[in-house]
Amino acid sequence: IHRGETVALFGKNGAGKSTILKLITGVCFPTSGEITVNGRVSALLELTSGFDPEFTGRENIYLKGQLLGLKNSEIEELEQTIIDFAEIEEYIDQPVRTYSSGMKARLGFSINVNIKPEILIVDEALSVGDEEFKNKCITKVNEIINKEDVTLLFVTHITSTAKEFCKRGIFMKDGKIVYDGNIEETIKKYEGTLKKKK
C-alpha cells in the first residue's frame, strides 16, 4: 500500500483483516515475513484503549498523545481542538471513569483524528455517538484523507461506506488476498461470495 492510497479491506469474520491491522499497529508481530510501516499511524480501532480511568479527560489526551509518539508541546497545540471536536468541554477535567461509554469513544476518536496522522486505520469506528456526531466523524475522516499524503486503510462490511472513502479494495479469505483491485470490482467479488452462501 503506497502513501496517499485509500484502501478498503473486505472479508468475512476470520479472514485475517483484524490480524493485519494488529500487525500494522504493532499490537502483534508476524510469525514469518515482515511488515514495514512508514509514517505516524492513527488507528480508530478500540477507541478507549489506553485511557487511565483515574485520569481526567485532559490528562488522558496527554497520555494517549504520548503513546502515539507526540511531544507535550505538540499535544498542547492540539488539546483544545481535541476537546472541541469531542464535545465534552464541561467534563474534560473529570476522571474518565465518570464518562459514559459514548463520551469515552468520542474522546478517543477525537484524539486519533486530530494528531495529524500519515496513516489512518479505521475498523468500523465511524459509528461513534448520535447521527450528528457520526456525520461529523465522516466529514473529519474525509478531510484527513483528502490531504494527498495520508494513507487510509478501512475495514468495513458496509460496501457503500467503503465506496465513499476508498479507491482500491482488497478482498481476503482465510488469511490470503483473493482479489486486489479498484473498489467497484472488489466489491462485486466480495458481494458475489456473499450471494453464493445464501
Listing of model-derived features with the role each one plays in the protein:
Residues Y62, E74-Y91:
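Conserved ABC ATPase "signature" region
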Residues D180-G181:
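ABC ATPase "signature
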Residues A162-E164:
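A short, surface-exposed alpha-helical micro-motif characterized by mixed small hydrophobic
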Residues T156-H157:
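H-loop/switch region of ABC-family ATPase nucleotide-binding domains
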Residues K134-K147:
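Helical segment within the ABC ATPase nucleotide-binding domain
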Residues D174-G175, Y190:
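Conserved ABC ATPase "signature" C-loop
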Residues F10-K12:
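The feature captures the beta-strand-to-loop junction immediately N-terminal to the Walker
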